[in-house]
Every structure is written in structure tokens, then in C-alpha cells.
Regions:
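Boundary at the C-terminal end of the N-terminal hydrophobic targeting segment
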Residues: 17-19
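Conserved, structured core segments of small domains
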Residues: 21-161
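Sec-dependent signal peptide recognition
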Residues: 2-8
Length: 161
């Protein structure tokens, strides 16, 4: 009885969390990526695909689909990274148009920083299986920070804290 019950739970979770539709679409229409402005400006100027500094370690480019999570993500992973930041807005389809697949999975470390921020484990996050080419980006939003490095808001995406 116990084995049957566990198998049924496993099948149910697999069908719910990893269906093809969920892997491709997620629950939100956009895929966001936080990026240092200097790195994005270089990619755009050279019309080249951007790969984040932790890509070789992580094996993918991190994204966030729920705009309500963006500031938690930024303040957890990047508070000590100085400089101006952007938030890139894309869709699964716009990424696919540049040959890049996106899958929705549980949170994962960024480099050696564990994903133990508030809300990290209550939904799936987009993992971009490649870099981001400027042609995949629908919009670029300015990220506002406090003098101490705290991420405060993303123009046109989030409301100020």
C-alpha cells in the first residue's frame, strides 16, 4: 500500500511540475534576467550573445518569471556587486527565436551562493539553456538601487520597496 501511494504521488508531481506546457510556458508571460549594465552594453555594442559570469559553473543562465521575486533575487545574490544594473525582459518564444530553450525548474545556486532567499522554493524558475542574444530581448528596464547597494525597484516592472 505504501509503495503504491508513493508511486502515485511521484507520478502526480511529475505530471504537474514537469509537463511540456509547464516547462515551456511557466505561470507568467515573461522571463526576466538581472544583469550588470556594463556587461549588457558590451553585448549590445558587439551584437553578441551574453553569458553571465557564473554560466560555466551553473550550466545555464538564471531567470525569474515572477516580477514579485526579482528584488528578493537581486538583494540575495547581488547586493555586493557594484554598478548600474538592468533587468532584461524576454519570453520563452523570443529566446527560442535565437535558438535557446528555456526550462522551468526549482531554484539553483548562482555560482557558490545558495538560493535560500524568501520565496525561493514556492515556484519554478526559468533556466535559460544558453546565453542571451540582444535579438531575444523585448525590453530593458533600469534597476534602481540605494547608496548601500540595496535593490529598490525596477522601472516598469516592480514597485519601490
Amino acid at each position: 500500500m505504501t509503495r503504491t501511494f508513493l508511486l502515485a504521488i511521484g507520478l502526480s508531481l511529475s505530471a504537474t511540475c514537469f509537463s511540456d506546457d509547464h516547462l515551456e510556458k511557466g505561470d507568467h508571460p515573461y522571463v526576466f534576467h538581472l544583469i550588470q549594465a556594463t556587461l549588457w552594453n558590451t553585448a549590445v555594442e558587439n551584437n553578441e550573445t551574453y553569458f553571465p559570469p557564473t554560466y560555466k559553473v551553473d550550466g545555464f543562465t538564471h531567470g525569474t518569471s515572477n516580477p514579485d521575486k526579482l528584488l528578493n533575487v537581486a538583494n540575495h545574490f547581488y547586493p555586493d556587486v557594484e554598478g548600474d544594473w538592468y533587468c532584461l525582459k524576454m519570453t520563452v518564444e523570443s529566446l527560442a527565436s535565437t535558438g535557446v530553450k528555456t526550462v522551468f525548474e526549482g531554484t539553483a545556486p548562482v555560482g557558490d551562493t545558495q538560493p535560500d532567499f524568501d520565496g525561493a522554493h514556492d515556484e519554478l524558475f526559468p533556466h535559460i539553456l544558453g546565453g542571451i542574444h540582444p535579438d531575444a530581448v523585448l525590453d530593458v528596464h533600469q534597476v534602481l538601487r540605494d547608496a548601500d547597494g540595496t535593490f529598490l525597484s525596477i522601472e516598469g516592472v516592480t514597485t519601490p520597496n
